[in-house]
């Protein structure tokens, strides 16, 4: 069918219908072809035949609504606020409008056959955002055609992902039966999902190795102090992980939310109405305030987990966290309205999520967000890429759930020595036994994402292929259990769910494999899901269908014989059903009782009354078979969903095993060693940080064809502060980051790149490496630097690790030196944290002369004949030159500039008598 012409489009090449006369006189049109006309001739022609400018609206500036036409002020014709009368619509569109009224702020995707369709304003929105064709559909006799746009149901995840990225929420109206029930003309449909950024469970819409967090946050004033109490609950709907924490300062909440990178954050309007701390940082969705009330939240929690009371959660019933948990679950229930419903609405279950776990603020190594960026733990600082980060360097996981697990470990390193040592022991066993490691990794390589697969099953959103993947994963568990027979694996709680494998899971996997065919279709409502021999009624229906198919084959032979048309074929078309096809030449010989159905260029198609009757019976059988197969599948999916919590426990064990075997592979192939973690009970050694020949875990892998120079570090026993000096580009910043990354690796239980190491557990890790303007908040580079420094000095303890680079360089020389000097003394004498201070201020080397826990180190360089060579070796002693001019030369600064800089430097050194010399400590820092 030809497309309708665009009414806004016209031909660019139409001949002008304008008269060629001017004032009754004929104009000269014979002056030559247009390409030969001069500019003067064209101007002359324009003056003789002036063109009148056509305008569609007043070009003047609009200052008042009265200047606008009614059409511009009113809602667009197809806006959902201006929908036509429901009674005038066709039945399908009538249902669509009813659902749209219930979901006015969401794009409504309505399943019709193989497509999800949108109508009215949503169709226009869909067409514009996804750049798909906007068409129309008959809306009723009084309505006429209405806008329509659609997406294929099998590709809906991809399109929904695009809509979510563009900030929209989606309501999914799907078919609730394979064929219309008896007495109904329309297939039953209903809202099955409300998709928002934080409630996604569909595989194609999620990042495999990253959590997708939905968070709820509440704040309230503390009547006993000036602080604001806050509670943050976070849930990954796809994996079931559920954590909650509380605090007292909004800055701490801000840090947690930056680290979390939640896909969606909800709150009640009362909590955020007068708050500014989150603006410009995150978008917060306001949710029903009553859902966050203590009474309703308590009821929501009890109903969801089938509890008589909430005391068993371990959360005080009067705490703010009860409200954040209840509000979050209420939001989840709203976005998954029909969780667990099968076609006949016989079963309803709750989506499977873990019991909320209390996360204590001091439970792990505290790393602020500036430090995370500086150390490039999960993404690079410059462009936010994965490649070049610590996670990129050490992630050798083979499964999606293992990838998420190692990311969580890096984001929250441990401070409890037993847990760290448990991980170390398992890695050690897997390093020593390469065959054990390789066998385990071979099993894991093809393991599906059991965490998210079981989550979809629990939400009754899993497809047939999802259940097959679950069964394949479960079938690998006994083999993994076989390899976990060493006592070291039994000492930790990680692998309890596999060592004590639930036999019900094995039986469930067997049931899945026995009932669902090996390669099932994506569609669940078109049959072809269930093996023969599973259900006697299904087998009987299939036998009946086979009989009809046999009749079709015999009928083709019989009609060919009776008509004497040898090339006759009995065929099927999805739109036309069954028909008899003959060539054009033979069509004159067809029997009289044949009825012409369709004419093609080289073929004629016919039907017979008997064939049409048989076709109706076949279609009815197919519909019954498809419906029964879907019902059987739903029952099986419910069984899997009921076991989703057990499957998830096994999945968490698999994810830990994947991480540990990956870290063992990393250690074995990169010559890593097991660091000795110093027990906190040994107060004389607990702060020690001693690493021999340590290497940067990321840079070492990037320097494929070059040798990485290893370096030592000794802090915490006698020395608390190292003053590190050396020229630009010599490796000071790399050394600082190396120390920080090795501390993190040690506290997640990993082995590290070094010759030997004794590492005390740090409670906090701070870095200040480089700074940039914060234009959004009007802060200069120097102010940003001072704010970061103040945060460190106000929060660090003697058990912290502090790494500072170039403090004080953003102001005048003497101001900067004074600040750097004072900060160094404060760290060494007041806080006594393990600290490294990299600087170009060589005067700071004097501090070690009167503060005994300060020591000078330098990055060694070779300088001969105005040529500078970086050796990247850190040694004891202070540097006395910065070699900044030589570094500029190496960077490609023009020779004239470099030579002139040398002359200027000589004059400055000759004339500068303001040498700084301090021989006694600053009294205020004693």
Swiss-Prot record:
ATP binds at residues 726-733. The keyword DNA-binding applies. GO terms for cellular component: cytosol. It holds the Pfam family MutS_V. InterPro entries: DNA_mismatch_repair_MutS, DNA_mismatch_repair_MutS-lik_N, DNA_mismatch_repair_MutS/MSH, DNA_mismatch_repair_MutS_C, DNA_mismatch_repair_MutS_clamp, DNA_mismatch_repair_MutS_core, DNA_mismatch_repair_MutS_N, DNA_mismatch_repair_MutS_sf. Keywords: ATP-binding, DNA damage, DNA repair, DNA-binding, Nucleotide-binding. SUPFAM superfamilies: DNA repair protein MutS, domain I, DNA repair protein MutS, domain II, DNA repair protein MutS, domain III, P-loop containing nucleoside triphosphate hydrolases. Residues 1-67 are annotated as: Disordered. It comes from the Bacteria. GO terms for molecular function: ATP binding; ATP-dependent DNA damage sensor activity; damaged DNA binding; mismatched DNA binding. Residues 18-44, 57-67 have a biased composition (Polar residues). Disulfide bonds: none annotated. GO terms for biological process: mismatch repair. The keyword Cell division does not apply. This protein is involved in the repair of mismatches in DNA. It is possible that it carries out the mismatch recognition step. This protein has a weak ATPase activity. Belongs to the DNA mismatch repair MutS family. HAMAP family: MutS. This is DNA mismatch repair protein MutS. It comes from Prochlorococcus marinus (strain NATL1A).
């Amino acid at each position: 069918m030809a497309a309708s012409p665009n009414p806004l489009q016209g031909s660019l090449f139409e001949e002008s219908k304008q008269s060629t006369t001017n004032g009754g006189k004929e104009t000269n049109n014979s002056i030559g072809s247009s390409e030969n006309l001069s500019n003067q001739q064209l101007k002359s022609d324009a003056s003789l035949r002036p063109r009148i400018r056509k305008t569609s609206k007043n070009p003047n500036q609009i200052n008042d609504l009265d200047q606008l036409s009614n059409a511009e002020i009113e809602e667009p014709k197809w806006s959902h606020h201006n929908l036509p009368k429901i009674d005038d619509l066709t039945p399908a569109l009538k249902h669509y409008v009813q659902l749209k009224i219930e979901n006015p702020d969401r794009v409504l995707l309505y399943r019709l056959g193989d497509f999800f369709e949108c109508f009215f304003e949503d169709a226009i929105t869909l067409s514009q955002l996804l750049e798909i064709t906007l068409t129309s559909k008959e809306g009723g006799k009084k309505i006429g055609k209405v806008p329509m746009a659609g997406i294929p149901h099998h590709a809906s995840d991809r399109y929904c992902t695009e809509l979510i990225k563009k900030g929209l929420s989606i309501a999914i109206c799907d078919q609730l039966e394979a064929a219309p029930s008896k007495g109904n003309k329309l297939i039953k449909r209903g809202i099955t999902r409300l998709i928002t950024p934080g409630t996604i469970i569909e595989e194609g819409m999620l990042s495999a190795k990253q959590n997708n967090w939905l968070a709820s946050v509440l704040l309230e004033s503390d009547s006993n102090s000036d602080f604001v109490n806050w509670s943050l609950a976070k849930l990954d709907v796809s994996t079931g992980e559920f954590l909650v924490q509380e605090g007292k300062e909004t800055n701490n909440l801000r840090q947690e939310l930056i680290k979390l990178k939640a896909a969606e954050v909800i709150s009640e309007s009362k909590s955020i109405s007068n708050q500014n701390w989150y603006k410009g940082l995150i978008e917060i969705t306001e949710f029903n305030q009553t859902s966050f009330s203590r009474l309703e939240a308590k009821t929501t929690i009890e109903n969801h987990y089938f509890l008589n009371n909430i005391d068993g959660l371990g959360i005080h019933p009067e705490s703010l966290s009860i409200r954040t948990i209840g509000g979050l679950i209420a939001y989840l229930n709203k976005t998954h309205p029909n969780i667990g419903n099968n076609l006949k609405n016989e079963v309803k279950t709750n989506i499977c999520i873990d019991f909320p776990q209390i996360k204590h603020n001091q439970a792990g190594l505290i790393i602020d967000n500036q430090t995370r960026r500086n150390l490039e733990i999960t993404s690079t600082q410059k462009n936010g890429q994965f490649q070049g980060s610590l996670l990129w360097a050490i992630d050798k996981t083979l499964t999606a759930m293992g990838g998420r697990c190692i990311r969580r470990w890096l984001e929250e390193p441990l401070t409890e020595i037993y847990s760290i040592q448990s991980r170390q022991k398992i890695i050690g066993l897997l390093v020593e036994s390469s065959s054990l490691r390789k066998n385990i990794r071979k099993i894991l390589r093809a393991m599906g994402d059991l965490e998210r697969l079981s989550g979809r099953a629990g939400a009754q959103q899993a497809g047939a292929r999802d259940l097959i993947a679950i069964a394949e994963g479960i079938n690998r568990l006994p083999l993994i259990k076989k390899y976990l027979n060493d006592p070291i694996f039994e000492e930790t709680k990680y692998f309890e769910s596999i060592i004590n494998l639930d036999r019900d899971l094995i039986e469930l996997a067997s049931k899945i494999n026995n009932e669902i065919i090996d390669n099932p279709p994506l569609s669940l409502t078109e049959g072809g899901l269930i093996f023969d021999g599973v259900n006697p009624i299904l087998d009987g229906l299939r036998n009946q269908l086979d009989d009809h198919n046999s009749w079709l084959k015999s009928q083709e032979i019989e009609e060919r014989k009776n008509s004497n048309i040898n090339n006759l074929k009995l065929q099927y078309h999805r739109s036309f059903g069954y028909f008899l096809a003959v060539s054009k030449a033979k069509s004159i010989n067809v029997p009289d009782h044949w009825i012409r159905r369709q004419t093609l260029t080289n073929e004629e198609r016919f039907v017979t009354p008997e064939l049409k009757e048989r076709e109706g019976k076949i279609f009815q059988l197919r519909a019954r078979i498809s419906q029964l197969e879907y019902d059987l599948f739903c029952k099986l999916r419910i069984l899997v969903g009921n076991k989703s919590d057990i499957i998830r426990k096994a999945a968490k064990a698999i994810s830990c095993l994947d991480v540990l075997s990956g870290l063992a592979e990393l250690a074995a192939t990169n010559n890593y060693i097991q660091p000795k973690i110093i027990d906190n009970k040994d107060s004389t050694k607990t702060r020690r940080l001693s690493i021999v020949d340590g290497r940067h875990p990321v840079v070492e892998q990037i320097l494929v064809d070059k040798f990485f120079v290893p370096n030592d570090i000794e802090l915490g026993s006698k020395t608390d502060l190292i003053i590190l000096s050396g020229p630009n580009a010599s490796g000071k910043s790399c050394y600082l980051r190396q120390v920080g990354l090795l501390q993190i690796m040690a506290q997640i239980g990993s082995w590290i790149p070094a010759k030997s190491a004794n590492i005390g557990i740090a409670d906090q890790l701070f870095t200040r490496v480089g700074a940039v303007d914060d234009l959004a908040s009007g802060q200069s580079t120097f102010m940003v630097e001072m704010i970061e420094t103040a945060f460190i000095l106000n929060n660090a303890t003697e058990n912290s690790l502090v790494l500072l680079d170039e403090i004080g360089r953003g102001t005048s020389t003497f101001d900067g030196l004074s600040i750097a000097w004072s900060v160094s003394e404060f760290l060494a004498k007041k806080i006594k944290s393990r600290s490294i201070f990299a600087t170009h201020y060589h005067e700071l080397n004097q501090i070690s002369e009167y503060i005994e826990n300060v020591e000078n180190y330098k990055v060694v360089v070779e300088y001969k004949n105005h040529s500078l060579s970086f050796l990247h070796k850190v040694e004891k002693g202070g540097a006395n030159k910065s070699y900044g001019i030589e570094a500029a030369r190496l960077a490609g600064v023009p020779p004239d500039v470099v030579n002139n800089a040398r002359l200027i430097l000589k004059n400055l050194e000759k004339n500068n008598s303001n040498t700084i010399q301090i021989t006694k400590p600053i009294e205020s820092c004693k």
